[in-house]
Amino acid sequence: GNNHSMKPLFLLSLLFLSLSLFSAEIIGKVIGVSDGDTITVSDNLDKGKFRIRLNKIDAPEKKQAFGNKAKQYLSSLIFGKQVSVRFKEIDRYGRVLGVIYCDGAEINLVMVQNGYAWHYSYYDKTPAYIQAEKQARADKKGLWADPNPINPYQFRKSQKKR
């Protein structure tokens, strides 16, 4: 009969179902942008407010060159808009570590592509992000226009020493 062709597809959809159980999604409106990698989303269902740390990326700190530009750029992309936040964990500060989707675009990746954030390569090995940072660096986009930009991680460490 014909039903043999259906089986692999069915198994595949089961696999995707089980995978998606490990991740959750918040759908809501962006009501705040704190900096280039932290936002606040109001959940559509119960209007609960979630602080979201954009996963896989590290934007310049506010005191750094490009810190404000990164914040403004992120705002221009998503502030006041409906987004979907996919996440698997919450950090020790109670922030949701998520990937933001808006109008079909993966916003975390867009930030890296345009030179408004570094790829957080220490924690994340996603090939698209590695490639995006290489390309932005090569094209001297955003923060890469500076010949020696300081990684936000290093910057935070140097601030703590003082």
Predicted regions located by residue number:
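Small beta-barrel nucleic-acid-binding modules, primarily SNase/OB-fold domains
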Residues: N2, K7-R162
